[in-house]
From Swiss-Prot:
Residue numbers annotated as active site: K35 (proton acceptor), Y257 (proton acceptor)
Post-translational modification N6-(pyridoxal phosphate)lysine, affected residues: K35
Binding site for substrate: R130, M305
Lineage: Bacteria, Pseudomonadati, Pseudomonadota, Betaproteobacteria, Burkholderiales
Gene Ontology biological process terms, A to Z: D-alanine biosynthetic process
Catalysed reactions listed for this entry: L-alanine = D-alanine
PANTHER family on file: ALANINE RACEMASE, ALANINE RACEMASE, CATABOLIC-RELATED
Keyword Ribonucleoprotein annotated: no
Protein name as annotated: Alanine racemase
Keyword Magnesium applies: no
Example GO molecular function: pyridoxal phosphate binding
Recorded superkingdom: Bacteria
Pathway this chain belongs to: Amino-acid biosynthesis; D-alanine biosynthesis; D-alanine from L-alanine: step 1/1
Its EC number(s): 5.1.1.1
Length: 369
């Protein structure tokens, strides 16, 4: 039989989270961000749950081609624009909208021969200092684009660095609005955190489009200040495996490589068929939460390439049977309906839910429900 591990993508949860993003930004259209292969979910697997969006935003032409092959005829936005001049031809052929964030991209457009003018999103560096024109140069970049016959329509975009934290977005939205004042065109500024935390009461933050990313996949961008449940989000990916062995420990016995865990009393542990080669974080410490048969317990010892060890004592003390064949939910929704949010696992491992989703290994079988 196949190794007993599986990831499940939940279509209804994707639909629920998309509806939640839309409700948080009334009157704005929603980009479903599917970069990084839909945050590890798989573009093809996530498409049915996200096809109610107004457009798809992604990174490269390969992802754009895949979305078109799925039958999508609506807007597609390249969030980082094109990477070389010849990409513009495929943008024309696939009717892609694309960001413009540097002078070189404007140069490529000006030299491009096309019969289908381009829809571009001029990106401002309003304070994050990654991509985009700084406010002092933004209008000059707009003027260059506006003079090009290759450009049909110019929209405006920026990206917030601190929408999920106490610093907030005021300094960036003010800079953006000042630089774009009176310029004609649509605006998109909000990522997931800004959409949930700031868009409801400020039309400037809602803009014409919001870019829903991690919110679609059931993770809270501002965890642990707020949980996914607080925002009404449902888990869209479940990683589950089976217990393939058990051991009875006595006080003083150690577990795993490096003997990093020592039992302080008699206890039962289960060996789960999941390890860092499956995408589970190797640096997750003892105490990282896990569900066994829907009951919350913890990992013990180091994560191995193919196995994790978990404490079964709390289940036995509660009168819940657990042993070989029992279900272990590493994150997501257990068969009984109990939920372990991916953000909790990520926090214990010192990372974020985004990384765990994107790290799901190719060897893990994936099903869609």
């Amino acid at each position: 039989m196949p190794r007993p591990i599986q990831a499940t993508i939940h279509t209804a949860a994707l639909q629920q989270n998309l509806a939640r993003a839309r409700a948080a930004a009334p009157d704005a259209r929603v980009w479903a961000v599917v970069k990084a292969n839909a945050y590890g979910h798989g573009i093809e697997r996530a498409f049915e749950g996200l096809r109610g969006a107004d457009g798809f935003a992604l990174l490269d032409l390969g992802e754009a081609e895949r979305v078109r092959q799925l039958g999508w005829r609506g807007p597609i936005l390249l969030l980082e624009g094109v990477f070389e001049p010849r990409d513009l031809e495929l943008c024309s052929r696939l009717s892609l909208w694309h960001a413009v964030h540097c002078d070189e991209q404007i140069d490529w457009l000006s030299a491009h021969k096309t019969h289908a003018p381009h829809r571009v999103f001029l990106k401002m560096n309003s304070g994050m200092n990654r991509l985009g024109f700084p406010p002092a140069r933004y209008r000059a970049a707009w003027a260059r684009l506006n003079a090009l016959p290759q450009v049909d329509e110019i929209s405006f975009m920026t990206h917030f660095s601190d929408a999920d934290g106490p610093r907030g977005i005021a300094h960036q939205i003010d800079a953006f609005c000042t630089a774009t004042q009176d310029l004609p065109g649509e605006r998109t500024v909000s990522n997931s955190a800004a959409t949930l935390r700031h868009a409801g009461g400020d039309a400037r933050v809602r803009g014409d489009w919001v870019r829903a990313g991690i919110v679609l996949y059931g993770s809270a961008a501002d965890h642990p200040e707020h949980t996914a449940a607080h925002w009404g989000l449902a888990p869209t990916m479940t990683l589950s495996a089976r217990i393939i062995g058990t051991q009875q420990l006595q006080a003083g016995d150690t577990v795993g490589y490096g003997s990093s865990f020592t039992a302080d009393r008699p206890m039962t542990i289960g060996v789960v068929a999941c390890g860092y080669a499956d995408g589970y974080p190797r640096h997750a410490p003892t105490g990282t939460p896990v569900l066994v048969n829907g009951v919350r317990t913890r990992t013990v010892g180091r994560v191995s390439m193919d196995m994790i060890t978990v404490d079964l004592t709390p289940l036995h003390e509660a009168g819940v049977e657990a042993g070989v064949g029992s279900e272990a939910t590493l994150w997501g929704r257990a068969s009984c309906g109990a939920v372990l949010c991916i953000d909790e696992v990520a926090q214990a491992a010192g990372t974020v839910g985004y990384e765990l989703m994107c790290a799901l290994a190719p060897r893990v079988p994936v099903v869609v429900d």
